[in-house]
Amino acid sequence: MVDKNIYIIQGEINIVVGAIKRNARWSTHIPLDEERDPLLHSFSHLKEVLNSVTELSEIEPNVFLRPFLEVIRSEDTTGPITGLALTSVNKFLSYALIDPTHEGTAEGMENMADAVTHARFVGTDPASDEVVLMKILQVLRTLLLTPVGTHLTNESVCEIMQSCFRICFEMRLSELLRKSAEHTLVDMVQLLFTRLPQFKEEPKSYVGTNMKKLKMRAGGMSDSSKWKKQKRSPRPPRHMTRVTPGSELPAPNGATLSCNLTSGMPFIDVPSSISSASSEAASAVVSPCTDSGLELSSQTTSKEDLTDLEQAGSPRESTTTESGSNEIGVSDQLDPQEGSHVEKAQSASVESIPEVLEECTSPPDHSASVHDMDYVNPRGVRFTQSSQKEGTALVPYGLPCIRELFRFLISLTNPHDRHNSEGMIHMGLHLLTVALESAPVAQCQTLLGLIKDEMCRHLFQLLSVERLNLYAASLRVCFLLFESMREHLKFQLEMYMKKLMEIITVENPKMPYEMKEMALEAIVQLWRIPSFVTELYINYDCDYYCANLFEDLTKLLSKNAFPVSGQLYTTHLLSLDALLTVIDSTEAHCQAKVLNTLTQQEKKETSRPSYEAVDSTQEANSTERATIDGKATGMASDALGLHLQSGGWLSAEHGKPRCNDVEEAGDSGADKKFTRKPPRFSCLLPDPRELIEIKNKKKLLITGTEQFNQKPKKGIQFLQEKGLLTIPMDNTEVAQWLRENPRLDKKMIGEFVSDRKNIDLLESFVSTFSFQGLRLDEALRLYLEAFRLPGEAPVIHRLLEAFTEHWRSCNGSPFANSDACFALAYAVIMLNTDQHNHNVRKQNVPMTLEEFRKNLKGVNGGKDFEQDILEDMYHAIKNEEIVMPEEQTGLVRENYVWSVLLHRGATPEGIFLRVPPGSYDLDLFTMTWGPTIAALSYVFDKSIEETIIQKAISGFRKCAMISAHYGLSDVFDNLIISLCKFTALSSESIENLPTVFGSNPKAHIAAKTVFHLAHRHGDILREGWKNIMEAVLQLFRAQLLPQAMVEVEDFVDPNGKISLQREEMPSNRGESSVLSFVSWLTLSGPEQSSVRGPSTENQEAKRVALDCIKQCDPEKMITESKFLQLESLQELMKALVSVTADEETYDEEDAAFCLEMLLRIVLENRDRVGCVWQTVRDHLYHLCVQAQDFCFLVERAVVGLLRLAIRLLRREEISGQVLLSLRILLLMKPSVLSRVSHQVAYGLHELLKTNAANIHSGDDWATLFTLLECIGSGVKPPDALQATARADAPDAGAQSDSELPSYHQNDVSLDRGYTSDSEVYTDHGRPGKIHRSATDADMVNSGWLVVGKDDIDNSKAGAGLSRPSPSPLVNQYSLTVGLDLGPHDTKSLLKCVESLSFIVRDAAHITPDNFELCVKTLRIFVEASLNGGCKSQDKRGKSHKYDSKGNRFKKKPKEGSVLRRPRTSSQHGTRGGHSDEEEDEGVPASYHTVSLQVSQDLLDLMHTLHTRAASIYSSWAEEQRHLESGGRKIEADSRTLWAHCWCPLLQGIACLCCDARRQVRMQALTYLQRALLVHDLQKLDALEWESCFNKVLFPLLTKLLENISPADVGGMEETRMRASTLLSKVFLQHLSPLLSLSTFAALWLTILDFMDKYMHAGSSDLLSEAIPESLKNMLLVMDTAEIFHSADARGGSPSALWEITWERIDCFLPHLRDELFKQTVIQDPMPTEPHSQNALASTHLTPAAGDPGHLPSPEIPSEVGACDSEKPEGTRATSSSSPGSPVASSPSRLSPSPEGPPPLAQPPLILQPLTSPLQVGVPPMALPIILNPALIEATSPVPLLSTPRPTDPIPTSEVN
């Protein structure tokens, strides 16, 4: 079966042959013989061949292509026929009729390329001709892009590309055709560079010899004499020409296309020849492999180029004055004669595309190409077999053609080449963009050389042009360069960034705004490259001799983000974008670290050394780039593939390894180079500390450089002082510094090294140059560019002499002697001046080569120098000036600067470090956060666009996240402070705040951000807390906070909560409540509110504001404070504490609100409260103790202290300190304390109910009971504390009130784990502070007065708070405790009694530590409740309106404002004022019921304790023995019980027996009777019973003699009668032990005295009848017991007691003896204990000497011992004067009997009445009694007391 492809070819043959035959030329002749026409003959032959085969593959591609190619080459064919042949060829390629694997394919492709690029046809009209050109483009594109195109040679590809360029740049062609050519070029360039990774680098020698063949013409067609494309074999004209040239010329339309295209205008206007040559030379010069050539100027033309030019035979090449690619040739214009000659020669038949001019104007080129040996037969058929036979087989194209194309594209971008039009430059930039996007160009060293030099230079020059399209395209190419290969372009990148900064900052009005915008866009784009910013910092800011690019750019961008006019433009936002890029990348890295902590830890375990890590990262980065480029390539090629079966990218992919794989391989090779580290670093990734050192050193170097540039010695000296240069000066070191530092003034270097004092330094300086292999002029050029040559001849001589010596030693002394060398060097300098100095050129004709040779004749040791060397030197100097630094300007200077840049890039200084993403983020952030936050703040403030505002907020949040990640508190504080300004909360007045805030969306965003950041990153917040708290305070003032934040706990309020936002009281102006309410609603002044109510807009704004604050959730700051780091927590507390009283800004409610927040925070942090306790405690101390008057804040402080105690007592580690802190309340002024008694009483009750089990220490119990006493009964706090509080008033608050009780022998202070910061107290307005320390001295001098260790350890727990010394005198024989009770509140007393009841009734809460305290407190409460507390109420005067709940939460309005609080606490002294109308509001109707309940409760409690005391003490003693615990030994004997329990309790009960209220009095008497007759008291001995009489019964009887209840006379009579009966009963019941007392007579006489008093006390007969009967009973019992009989009396005479008794009785019952004993005669007395009268009379009248426990008693009132007025005078006198009389009219002293500390308590027991032989039962009275409200001060009734027994316990303290 015949191959279908054969039919396709046959069809195409028929079409073309038919067209040839139909041509007008054939119409006038008979059909020609095909044998005579070569074209038809070829087709005929092909037909025969095709008919003889069945498969197309059986014949070579050349066979079926040749006829078509001959048609294309034929000069005689018309355009349409040529077009048909081109269409056929294109079809063959598109249909893949050519087998890529066929061995003849290469030859066929080469012939096809040659034919199409040299297509010739007879032109008709321009439109038809352009159709043919379009088809040529199409064939060339298809040829290169299909798989068979890979067989093309380097030369063919260059031909194809150049053909396309000619069409593209020919302005006479239509735009459509030129654009088609442009698109074709794009596809071709993309294909070629996509295939770049497949090609291998060729040996340099191969590159050097082959490049000459492949140079595409860089100039226009007129420059044929300069750039000659290599000629192919001659092409003779066709043999069978029908028409002579002459006949064709006259034809009007006979001009061929060539004539049309070349009439006086060149096809291509491209860069000049020297430009191309020098660009190629430079690429070789800067190649990293040629170190020796690095020091050559990049503008020198290499020998290779010069040779090439000579071979090209161009006379102009040696006469051009170009000194570099930027200079223009002297003669670039085409010779007119040459132009006309060309036109004539080519008029008949010309090539349509490639080489119109070269063949006519240039001699044959001798540099052979692959095709130079081809033979072309007369028909134009080329035969290449001969060359293959000779061993020159066709080589597929590779790197050489790509390099040549790349060089050509770069040459197109030279803005200084006048041949390069704007369109050409743009085209070059566009194709370079495609090339860089398609391939990893940096891996190709041959291309890299071109990039480093010419390409970068042209691009930077283009940044200065005013054409925006070129400027933009240049920026695009620059981005691609520095994105992918910045590691090779360190100093180029530095120059680029500097140029961009210059463009942004320049104030030139001609500079378009768009250029600045694009420059900023370019920076933003670069900054978004991962790690780019970090690399800027590492490679430039941390390089001694580079600019601080990152720092400078950051400053520039920050400054540029602030609009001068106030209006935001794109440039401002772009600057912000750039700054945010750093923030974004850093934040992303931080997020990744946070999210992948575990993964990173695993990586660390298996991590490699740092340099390997860097390499791998770079490799990964490169691979990533390759992948990205690959994707871009694919996408682009998809778009460009058009209808072809096989697009360019498919062709590139065909038969090659994956691009990524190749690139990775290349990168892995390049990585070896990356491991080189810059000399300034100790390792590849230096740590931040090292970078800081480098930066510091860099600053010093810059300063030293500046000083050197002014005075070299001064600069060197400065660097030596700073340790950067050694002392003494090291010449080698200084020379190296002079060479390395580009900032040094070249003139100063010249002067310094040429100084005759520095000869050694000059030698060292010269030795830093490497002159090996360099010609003298080249070495001199290098030498003289390093410094400015001074003008003095001796100095020049010295410098040149050193140079020539070094050059000779480096090059083996090539000249005769050093003088010859010196002369030549001098001659070169003179030549340079002669050729390039403008002044010299004006006066003289420049020296010629011959003159130069003549000048040096015979100088080389009498001989001549080699003429070739002199010629080379002459041309080198003539063509390129030796630039004297800082002498030239303009282009010459630019060339010099560029050569220096290239030179630096080739040294180790040019190493560019690539770093992994995330490295040095902290360093970068530290440098950028300030400018960034400032810019963000400005943009946020000025912008109204939502997107920009959100961008700014996002930036704020990211900055916050980074600062939190790295723990940068100062950054976060700055950010919060900045944001707080935008919340509008601090600037607005309170009246307008809800409206203004509610209607400001930007303020909402700022507020939400502030609170969100505080919630999320509060850990690192420090100073910012203050701003946040100020904002919250503003919200509080404006009543915008949630209800939960303004409601606080309260002990007294029935709901348990009150609001901190109190109602306003009506002002003095008489404003009505309605107006006040309206004013409050509108949040405006009374003037406005009285006119109109709140507007709808204001209401809506307030609603929006409330919603916003709800979303902010400020309460979360409190609830989540438990998660804050300790330091942040302390700062938060410090911010809250700082809102305290000062002159200006103080507001009581603000302070109360802050206090409540502080307390809530402390409670939230109770797990670590020890760390912050001192702060809060000292703050509470300040608020409470310093308060001079009561105010709301003081009340909240007191409540807060109690709340803390209630919550924190459960925590063992802090409970002691908390309880000690309650003593703050005792330090308050009594007047202030009494005003908060309600709160304290209720708070203490709550505390004891919830935490009694957690109180263990006696000191703690002492604190609580003292508080109960002060609050419940108005007892003044212990004097020691009050004295201390007064003394510390100017300097309170900084003391530790916990030191006293913790001052033990081995435990000086409590460890709080946290030392209070002095700043906590700086706002308190006190001058000096004494801060805590652990020293004893500090303890003693602290707020709690430590009197002495012994005082603390030995004092009674009841005293509790270190009694003052000396102690005031206390009467032990009074029923009261002897304290001065101040005013107290009955409700408070009732609550305190409840608290006491709770303790007493629960056996678990009564402990040895608190028993005595409890008893003492009971007695104090008894005294306070006497007569219903009338004494206290009288003292209080009018009750405070504070006690009224109605006024408790009202506040006085500030004048002129309804909303504002008064600013000073004095305006707020109370929650309300005094009011007569409401005087009794604090004493409700049930007051008397309440007071009665209090007294009854106290009675019950005392009786309970009394009955339980014995069992309680027994159990404690047993427990102590069982546990063998240490501490104070607990005794359960009767003496202890009496002294500590029974006696004080009986005194308390007896005290209530003196109550003015009859019910209380009678009930108390009943309790007293039960108590005295209880079974446990039978254990008491005689002394204790005597004490009972002296301390309980006698004071009771004394008190009852007073007129307690004047209104209830009968009741008082009954009371007195019951009391006297009780006295008699107790006396008789315990008569037996009492008789053993040595003081019995005194006791008995005292009883008689009371009988006397009582008998005359009442007005009724009740007592006058009852007393004698009681007395008779006692006398009879005593007489029966023979007490009145003297033991030693003779004859049974009566004893002295008998005499004394009747002396006393006779005073008031003179007839009783007769009545009782008239029939009785006293018998001999029974034996009794000897009681002598002397003993009675003398021993016990005075206290025992030296007994410290006995204190003198108060005076005895005279009426106690006096008889009634009717008594005989003599009797009275006897009584008074008798030494044994128990009573005396004159005052006398007595000593108390021994007693221990006060009593305690225990559960109730069943009363068991006793039966005693001496007991006489007296029925109890039950008569109603009316009480007298007076209180009588008790006095001791008896002056006679016994001395204590030796075994009695010595009292340790008094009951106070």
UniProtKB/Swiss-Prot annotation:
Residues 690-880 form the SEC7 domain. Pfam families: Sec7, Sec7-like_HUS, TPR_28. Guanine-nucleotide exchange factor (GEF) for members of the Arf family of small GTPases involved in trafficking in the early secretory pathway; its GEF activity initiates the coating of nascent vesicles via the localized generation of activated ARFs through replacement of GDP with GTP. Recruitment to cis-Golgi membranes requires membrane association of Arf-GDP and can be regulated by ARF1, ARF3, ARF4 and ARF5. It comes from the Eukaryota. The keyword Transport applies. Can form homodimers and probably homotetramers. Interacts with COPG1; the interaction is independent on ARF1 activation. Interacts with ARF1, ARF3, ARF4 and ARF5. Interacts with RAB1B (GTP-bound form); required for GBF1 membrane association. Interacts with GGA1, GGA2 and GGA3. Interacts with USO1. Interacts (via SEC7 domain) with PNPLA2 (via C-terminus); the interaction is direct. Can form homodimers and probably homotetramers. Interacts with COPG1; the interaction is independent on ARF1 activation. Interacts with ARF1, ARF3, ARF4 and ARF5. The modification Phosphothreonine is found at T505, T1335. One of its GO terms (biological process) is vesicle-mediated transport. Residues 1-378 are annotated as: Interaction with RAB1B. Inhibited by brefeldin A (BFA). Inhibited by golgicide A (GCA). The gene is GBF1. It is a peripheral membrane protein. InterPro entries: ARM-type_fold, GBF1-like_TPR, Mon2/Sec7/BIG1-like_HUS, Sec7_C_sf, Sec7_dom, Sec7_dom_sf. This is Golgi-specific brefeldin A-resistance guanine nucleotide exchange factor 1. GO terms for cellular component: endoplasmic reticulum-Golgi intermediate compartment; Golgi apparatus; lipid droplet; membrane. It comes from Cricetulus griseus. It is found in: Golgi apparatus, cis-Golgi network; Endoplasmic reticulum-Golgi intermediate compartment; Golgi apparatus, trans-Golgi network; Golgi apparatus. Residues 1-211 are annotated as: DCB (dimerization and cyclophiln-binding). The DCB (dimerization and cyclophilin-binding) and HUS (homology upstream of Sec7) domains are necessary for dimerization. The DCB domain is proposed to support constitutive homodimerization; the HUS domain interacts with the DCB domain which may occur intramolecular or intermolecular. Residues 1284-1294, 1775-1793 have a biased composition (Low complexity). Keywords: Cytoplasm, Golgi apparatus, Guanine-nucleotide releasing factor, Lipid droplet, Lipid-binding, Membrane, Phosphoprotein, Protein transport, Transport. Residues 316-328, 615-625, 1295-1308 have a biased composition (Polar residues). Residues 215-256, 291-370, 601-626, 1284-1333, 1430-1484, 1739-1806, 1837-1856 are annotated as: Disordered.
